[in-house]
């Protein structure tokens, strides 16, 4: 039997894993399994350009490199179980795939609100089909939109809805400020002011108790007893890792798949995890395992995991350095951009303005024990470029020990 690597998950992380395995010298078979009907595509535009009707699928689709032209694609298929001791996975059509190595790239799915009320009119944004369905509702005349969750996706959806001409857009969140969790108070206040200036309403410091309506949602009941009228609800309340198929294999599946510093899973050198499903210790920081849902992680983790797999499959003895990525993300909202490098969440207790003013374009630094651990720019292209100049400084820093 020919040697084969199975990649469970045909998203960006899965595609990059296949490409990096070829780049690292793997000449055996590669099978990618994905539950969507589409080839891998870029997800960040879903809550922005796709919702706004400015990005057809052709502009989102990744073009696989020639090196993976012989990869076997099993789309519209889902991995439902794994027997790691036997090195097999079972798909939802009953077929069983054996493997010499396994790449876990099954990603996340949106968390749903467990509240009473109708389901019709309630949406999430994770897939192309999600975004296209939501766009149809946002463009209905007179639609009133409530976004539950003031994180990155929630704020992007709210901004896009305003840009489409939706008259009533309300964002609900139990925290006192938008994006307070990852970015802290200073930028949270700046973002709140910018969104309100552009017509977004906020109900902060309250949760969702349920939904009104019979066949379709007509309002959102808040924990303080008030009701916000709504024809469309977008639930942006976090993610759940797609790891149920790995149950029964003795793995730590709390909040993703726990890996070691080389992205190997469960002391099994033939199994690695990549993308936002991987909960890994970042050697650049404090070594505490965390998932990272930023744009740069699929490619960075795929490259490192491919080297770890090839080392095992080829019997190489060369030492590999621990995975130590510098997380990078951006978020376009209205006419401004958030650009981040590093790990701001680790430095929220010591936030300093490095340049500009929170009332305008601003560059903010996040520090831990006096050391810069992340920078975030809010504003136009010039301040985003200023943030990029700090990337080199962040990359040069030694590991943070706590």
Residue ranges and their predicted role:
Residues 2-3, 279-382:
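Mid-to-C-terminal Rossmann-like scaffold of FAD/NAD(P)H-dependent oxidoreductases
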Residues 133-183, 187:
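Rossmann-like NAD(P)H-binding beta-loop-alpha module
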Residues 120-141, 215-221, 226-304:
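FAD-site-proximal beta/loop scaffold in flavoenzymes
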Residues 27, 73-90, 97, 164-261:
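A Rossmann-like FAD-binding core segment of flavoenzymes
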């Amino acid at each position: 039997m020919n040697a084969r690597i199975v990649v469970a998950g045909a998203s960006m992380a899965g595609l990059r894993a296949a490409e990096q395995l070829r780049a690292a010298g793997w000449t055996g078979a590669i099978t990618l399994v994905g539950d969507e009907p589409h080839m891998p595509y870029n997800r960040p535009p879903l809550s922005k350009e796709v919702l706004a009707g400015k990005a057809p699928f052709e502009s989102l689709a990744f073009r696989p490199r020639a090196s993976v032209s012989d990869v076997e694609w099993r789309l519209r298929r889902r991995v439902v179980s794994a027997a790691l001791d036997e090195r097999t996975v079972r798909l939802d059509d009953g077929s069983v795939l054996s493997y010499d190595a396994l790449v876990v790239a099954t990603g996340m799915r949106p968390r749903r609100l467990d509240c009473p009320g109708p389901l019709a009119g309630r949406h999430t944004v994770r897939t192309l089909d999600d975004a296209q369905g939501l766009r149809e509702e946002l463009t209905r005349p007179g639609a009133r939109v409530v976004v539950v969750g003031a994180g990155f996706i929630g704020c992007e959806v709210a901004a896009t809805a305003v840009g489409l001409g939706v008259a009533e857009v309300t964002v609900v969140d139990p925290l006192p400020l938008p994006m307070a969790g990852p970015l802290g108070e200073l930028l949270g206040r700046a973002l709140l002011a910018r969104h309100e200036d552009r017509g977004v309403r906020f109900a902060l410091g309250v949760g969702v108790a349920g939904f009104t309506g019979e066949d379709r949602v007509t309002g959102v009941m808040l924990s303080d007893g008030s009701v916000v009228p709504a024809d469309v609800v977008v639930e942006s309340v976090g993610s759940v890792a797609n790891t149920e198929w790995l149950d029964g294999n003795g793995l730590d599946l709390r909040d993703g798949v726990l890996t070691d510093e080389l992205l190997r899973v469960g002391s099994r050198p033939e199994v690695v995890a990549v993308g936002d499903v991987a909960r890994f210790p970042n050697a650049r920081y404090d070594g505490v395992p965390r998932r990272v849902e930023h744009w740069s992680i699929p490619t960075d983790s795929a490259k490192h995991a491919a080297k770890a797999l090839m080392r095992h499959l080829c019997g190489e003895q060369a030492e590999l350095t621990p995975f130590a990525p510098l997380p990078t993300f951006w978020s376009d909202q209205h006419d401004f951009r958030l650009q981040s490098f590093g790990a701001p969440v680790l430095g929220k207790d010591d936030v300093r303005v490095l340049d500009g003013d929170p009332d305008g374009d601003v560059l903010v630094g996040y520090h831990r024990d006096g050391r810069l651990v992340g920078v975030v720019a809010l504003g136009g292209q010039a301040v985003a470029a200023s943030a990029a100049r700090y990337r080199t400084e962040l990359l040069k820093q030694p590991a943070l020990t706590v």
